A protein has these predicted regions:
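Well-ordered, non-membrane alpha-helical segments in soluble/globular domains
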Residues: 1-3, 32-36, 67-77
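Aromatic-rich peripheral "rim/lid" segments of glycoside hydrolase catalytic domains that contact
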Residues: 59-64, 68, 72, 76, ...
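Aromatic- and acid-rich polysaccharide-binding/catalytic face
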Residues: 2-40, 44-60, 88, 92-95
């Protein structure tokens, strides 16, 4: 909040509010708590929300039960995000399925180059409102100095 207060004091604004969050591996309570966090963030700022990273953490995903819990969490959260007009973007953070702590959240097996069952589910579930499959974002490299000159601002 101090950052936002400084922005306001200098008559500046932001275009959106980013959220980056991970819940533990319980699905139902965690999914609702995450959606509540999104709602509270909206109520606080009344700005579009971009969820830069979300997933379940603390889950080795080594059992069939745990993988089902992760899938249930993903389904519930994405359905909830898609119902909220103020959520413009979201991205599941994909750990590798071989990651000791967070493997149950992996969308891609990096070693085999194969999409996981969770990856296929994510692909099917929906798209953030701001994403257009027909108009993918193309990144363009900028020299560091040009970026600094163009976008640097001082917040006192």
């Amino acid at each position: 909040v101090p950052f936002m207060k400084k922005m306001e004091e200098q008559n500046m604004d932001v275009d959106f509010i980013p959220i980056h969050h991970y819940w533990n591996w319980y699905a139902d309570e965690g999914a609702q708590a995450f959606l509540d966090l999104v709602d509270e963030t909206w109520k606080m700022y009344h700005k579009p929300i971009w969820i830069t990273e979300f997933a379940i953490s603390g889950d080795p995903g080594k059992t069939k039960f745990q993988r089902k819990v992760v899938m249930r969490y993903m389904k519930k959260v994405i359905a909830g995000l898609d119902k909220r007009d103020y959520v413009e973007r979201y991205a599941w953070f994909s750990f590798s399925p071989t990651d000791y702590k967070n493997g149950g959240s992996g969308l891609l097996n990096h070693y085999e180059g194969k999409i996981t069952d969770l990856g296929y589910l994510y692909q099917k579930l929906g798209m953030p409102k701001g994403y257009d499959r027909n108009n993918p974002v193309k990144a363009k490299a900028n020299p560091k100095e040009d970026v600094i000159k163009k976008y640097y601002i001082t917040v006192k």
